[in-house]
From Swiss-Prot:
Name of the protein described by the UniProt record: Hsp70-Hsp90 organizing protein 1
Start-end of Basic and acidic residues biased regions: 232-248
PROSITE patterns cross-referenced by the UniProt entry: TPR, TPR_REGION
Protein task: Mediates the association of the molecular chaperones HSP70 and HSP90. Mediates nuclear encoded chloroplast preproteins binding to HSP90 prior to chloroplastic sorting.
Length: 572
């Protein structure tokens, strides 16, 4: 069973046995080859073993299976970073942020990737910045002296190479085209080398001057050719386009006034006059959409897409038609299945042109489809039955089977906090701590007064040796159920472990593990890099009197306590 193999893989990953995790994820993928989460998890395991090429392959497969899942881009960026492909890592994280602009993991990854790019460009060629970014091509295209060079493939190849590796500029400086381009990019005029042979100009001092008495002969101006008259057919076509454009403007004005019937008349006239501009069709489709005539809107959008591809119209115009079609389909949707063609239309639109509005509409449609599915599937009675089946398997210690029934119970009733609590316990038994923690937190979110939710969450934290966090969770549960013995016993266990660490009674292995875990905590990292705290730690070792003064500061004392809990500082 794929879920069982996945749970075993997650458990191995949590314990740091990445090779075993990879084996279990591979087994799960063989059973469920279209499950994007499995490829994502295996990518993370490969990356943990510094097998970045394999991690990259799995990350790409993740995105292929689920293009709009942000974690896939996070995996892709991490793999590129591991392979020192910093620019590609930046691109991957940015694509992920297009999908989910608020994703903190992607933001953090992007910052790391950009920092790596900056470090890789340390001590750059003094002219390197001039060749970076798309502005280079814009400047070369707009300057008459370099515009023609862009038609020469060897020149384009040289400039692309310099963009990739600015230090290679020295290899091409003998090429006058590169020198000319450098002058344009730096806004500096380089003096060209003197012409050779017959092309050399004669200095004025050596030239014979004409006698002042000889009259200057005025050159006869060549007659300029008269402009050729436009071909009648071309002229008619131009006139038709102008006429159609005016009709479109009249339609736009009517649309702004909410005079939809008049707007449709003008757009229809424009379509009859000029069928080579699909904007008339998409505009009429927009009017039909406002009027609630969704079938007519979809018909116009289909025509616009078909005609746009025939004419090789701008991708943005084709994407607009597909987005409008998707919007009309969502308006007509009455069940989860009705959202499928709308989602397909939005996905095709994004293939033509990535647009934030279209992406938002796609996410909304997928969310609505899921809500409809849950609504149609919602049955609390069947959910209770599935939960009881899960309980039976749990008692028999058949945890993967129990998880299967708890998952079905949650699908039948997403608000069943007990199903989340029981599934959290099953995941914990399998060693799948991240999943267990997630379910326990969801249980608490659904019912903050349910004490089992707190004990489930704290049990995971205790297992992970996060004793301070576990104690906070137990205490939060006691606020709702002060006499709960399981929560009270949990607090005692946490206090024992914390005191044991504070007394320095840990074995060298336990201390090393605790310190390693503590160093992964961003808060601990910030404390250790704080100049003030570094001075405090130095005084604790070398200047006891100064240390006593520091201890009178509550903020400093709180930070010291955190370092003690993490095993970084030991008080003897």
């Amino acid at each position: 069973m794929a879920e069982e193999a996945k749970a075993k893989g997650n458990a191995a990953f949590s314990s740091g046995d990445f090779t075993t995790a990879i084996n279990h994820f591979t087994e799960a993928i063989a059973l469920a080859p279209t499950n994007h989460v499995l490829f994502s998890n295996r990518s993370a395991a490969h990356a943990s073993l510094h097998q970045y090429a394999e991690a990259l392959s799995d990350a790409k497969e993740t995105i292929k299976l689920k293009p709009y899942w942000p974690k896939g881009y996070s995996r892709l960026g991490a793999a590129h970073l591991g392979l020192n492909q910093f620019e590609l890592a930046v691109t991957a994280y940015k694509k992920g942020l297009d999908v989910d602009p608020t994703n903190e993991a992607l933001k953090s990854g992007l910052a790391d990737a950009e920092a790596s790019v900056a470090r890789s460009r340390a001590a750059p060629n003094p002219f390197g910045d001039a060749f970076q970014g798309p502005e280079m091509w814009t400047k070369l295209t707009s300057d008459p002296s370099t515009r023609g060079f862009l038609q020469q493939p060897d020149f384009v190849n040289m400039m692309q190479e310099i963009q990739k590796n600015p230090s290679s500029l020295n290899l091409y400086l003998k090429d006058q085209r590169v020198m000319q381009s450098l002058g344009v990019l730096l806004n500096v005029k380089f003096r060209p080398p003197p012409p050779q042979g017959d092309e050399a100009e004669v200095p004025e001092s050596d030239m014979g001057q004409s006698s002042s008495n000889e009259p200057e002969v005025e050159k006869k101006r060549e007659p300029e050719p008269e402009p050729e008259p436009e071909v009648t057919e071309e002229k008619e076509k131009k006139e038709r386009k102008e006429k159609a454009k005016k009709e479109k403007e009249l339609g736009n004005a009517a649309y702004k006034k909410k005079d939809f019937e008049t707007a449709i008349q003008h757009y229809s006239t424009a379509i009859e006059i000029d069928d080579e501009d699909i904007s008339y069709l998409t505009n009429r489709a927009a009017v039909y959409l406002e009027m609630g005539k969704y079938n007519e809107c979809i018909e116009d959008c289909n025509k616009a897409v078909e005609r746009g591809r025939e004419l090789r119209s701008d991708y943005k115009m084709v994407a607009r038609a597909l987005t409008r079609k998707g919007t009309a389909l969502t308006k007509m949707a009455k069940c989860s299945k009705d959202y499928e063609p709308a989602i397909e239309a939005f996905q095709k639109a994004l293939t033509e042109h990535r647009n934030p509005d279209t992406l938002k509409r796609l996410n909304d449609a997928e969310r609505a489809k899921k809500e409809w599915e849950q609504k149609q599937y919602f049955d609390p009675k069947l959910g209770d039955e599935e939960r009881e089946k899960g309980n039976d398997f749990f008692k028999e210690q058949k945890y993967p089977e129990a998880i299967k029934h708890y998952t079905e119970a949650i699908k039948r009733n997403p608000n069943d906090h007990k199903a989340y609590s029981n599934r959290a316990a099953s995941y914990t038994k399998l060693g799948a701590m991240p999943e267990g923690l997630k379910d326990a937190e969801k249980c608490i979110e659904l019912d903050p007064t349910f004490s089992k939710g707190y004990s489930r969450k704290a049990a995971v934290q205790f297992f992970l040796k996060e004793y301070d966090n576990a104690m906070e969770t137990y205490q939060a549960g006691l606020e709702h159920d002060p006499s709960n013995q399981e929560l009270l016993d949990g607090v005692k266990r946490c206090v024992q472990q914390i005191n044991k660490a504070n007394r320095g009674d840990l074995t060298p292995e336990e201390l090393k593990e605790r310190q390693a875990k503590g160093m992964q905590d961003p808060e601990i990292q910030n404390i250790l890099t704080d100049p003030v705290m570094r001075q405090v730690l130095s005084d604790l070792q070398e200047n006891p009197s100064a240390a006593q003064k520091h201890m009178q500061n509550p903020m400093v004392m709180n930070k010291i306590q955190k370092l003690i809990s993490a095993g970084i500082v030991q008080m003897k």
